[in-house]
């Protein structure tokens, strides 16, 4: 990682990083809850399991933690982490859509659309938190 002369790489302690990751999980889970409620109100099937809190909160936590691990690896090994995450994050979000498309039969367009939005919301909350507690430069 190259830094401008006089710049110092910012490193946060593990408790700060943990707090940021937990905050991202909470914020993303609340946003997911709003999306799930809106989708159910708009006609998504009531029995569509991915729109149940137990499902999306768990998967949100898994995604945010996995993203934090990936972010830490990118920070450590990439010569230009900003450039890498600029294409890597959107690519991974789009790839994460694939399993949701397989659920059209169960969730319909509204249910699956809500899931796709949830992926974007989780990624946005996570990247915001990672940039605060694990800056790339």
Regions found by a protein language model. Give the residues of each.
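Membrane-water interface at the C-terminal end of transmembrane alpha helices
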Residues: 16-28, 121-137
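Transmembrane alpha-helical segments of multi-pass membrane transport proteins and ion-pumping complexes
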Residues: 28-37, 64-72, 97, 123-128
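Hydrophobic alpha-helical transmembrane segments
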Residues: 18-22, 26, 57-61, 85-90, ...
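Internal alpha-helical transmembrane segments of multi-pass membrane proteins
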Residues: 17, 49, 65, 72, ...
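Short, Lys/Arg-rich, polar N-terminal cytosolic tail immediately upstream
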Residues: 1-15
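Cytoplasmic membrane-interface segments at the C-terminal ends of transmembrane helices
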Residues: 8-12, 69-85, 127-137
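Membrane-helix boundary connector in multi-pass membrane proteins
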Residues: 98-114
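A loop-to-helix transmembrane entry motif
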Residues: 48-63
